[in-house]
Amino acid sequence: MSGGLDILSLKEDDITKMLVATTHLGSENVNFQMEQYVYKRRADGVNIINLGKTWEKLQLAARAIVAIENASDVFVISSRPIGQRAVLKFAKYTDTTPIAGRFTPGAFTNQIQPAFREPRLLVVTDPMTDHQPIMEASYVNIPVIAFTNTDSPLRYIDIAIPCNNKSAHSIGLMWWLLAREVLRLRGTISRTVEWPVVVDLYFYRDPEEAEKEEAAAKELLPPPKIEEVVDHPVEETTNWADEVAAETVGGVEDWNEDTVKTSWGSDGQF
């Protein structure tokens, strides 16, 4: 698939990332259409995915995405929580349209509802959980790219990228690799320069674990320094209220003394 070019071949660093993220570990069951991507079966029953074919299908999917003139016509979908953050990050760097969370039924087929969309290409995280958009895409002839495990059904899927889509690290790494390959084909980044965006941004983080990490980080912080408060001597203040009251009492005249008491009755006038 790489055409014999070394620059397009799978690098050792990428292989190491895939092995650490358990991208090569499939499930114990195998769909008959996924047998071509299985390297061998371990003694414990786990099927090993051929990472060479994974890389070839990843490059094919990236070329299909780049072939769409308007990037917003490419819809990336993930109903599973472990892939929602990766989908949002992928859409951010590739200018595609994300659908993270529940998919509204009829979004591709019912023209009456406000959520109606007309994408030209779909990229889904799991064919099992994202079966609704895949089914609707088949009604309106929309090609579908999917990250598939060894037990995933390939009905209505045009490009299957074999990988472990049940691991948060694996699915995050695959979305990161796909985004990097898309940007390389567009010419946004060079193949000789490492992409500065780290793969950790695509990993799903459990909210409870994140809260525990924040609490543990706060415990490791040193206690805040308490500044000593210096008591300054307070000057004695005069009670101005007493002085004002004394002056007021001393200066008041008895107005009753100057008042001329006139008896209207003595003058005989009424």
UniProtKB/Swiss-Prot annotation:
Example of a GO biological process term: ribosomal small subunit assembly
Name this protein carries in UniProt: Small ribosomal subunit protein uS2
Entry's family note: Belongs to the universal ribosomal protein uS2 family.
Keywords: Cytoplasm, Developmental protein, Nucleus, Ribonucleoprotein, Ribosomal protein
SUPFAM superfamilies associated with the record: Ribosomal protein S2
Keyword RNA-binding: no
Superkingdom assignment: Eukaryota
Gene that encodes it: sta
Organism of provenance: Drosophila persimilis
Matching Pfam families: 40S_SA_C, Ribosomal_S2
Lineage: Eukaryota, Metazoa, Ecdysozoa, Arthropoda, Hexapoda
HAMAP family recorded: Ribosomal_S2_euk
